[in-house]
């Protein structure tokens, strides 16, 4: 029997990854062929990022593998941020089958984060 809320650190590492320019293709684009991948563009100095990130992580973990999350520090990965035309953070994009399918900028309330993750999962079939 599988119980909710009993995930291990290994489970978390499989679902939520820190991604950089050298791993973006594998961890986001290629991984999105199997399940949608939500990409959180953030920076350590960004106040709203500090509340959005953990809220997104909680929803991704609650989805039990139906979606994954990649976290990208824009200060350390400026090339990806430029390619994605990130103008402000936090910025979130969802990828499926290698393409961005949804996204938003700025912090959202918990109900909208939950709805966003549900939309992404639904888009991924």
Specify the residue positions occupied by each region the protein language model found:
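Proteins that catalyze or organize thiol-disulfide redox chemistry
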Residues: 1-65, 78-79, 83-85, 89-91, ...
């Amino acid at each position: 029997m599988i119980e909710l809320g009993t995930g291990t650190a290994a489970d978390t590492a499989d679902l939520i990854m820190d991604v950089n320019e050298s791993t973006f293709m594998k961890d986001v684009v290629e991984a999105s062929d199997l399940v949608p991948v939500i990409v959180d563009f953030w920076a350590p100095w960004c106040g709203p990022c500090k509340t959005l990130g953990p809220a997104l992580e909680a929803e991704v973990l609650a989805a039990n593998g139906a979606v994954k999350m990649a976290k990208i520090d824009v200060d350390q990965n400026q090339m990806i941020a430029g390619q994605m035309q990130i103008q402000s953070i936090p910025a979130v994009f969802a990828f499926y089958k290698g393409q961005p399918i949804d996204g938003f900028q700025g912090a959202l309330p918990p109900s909208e984060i939950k709805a966003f993750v549900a939309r992404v999962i639904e888009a991924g079939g």
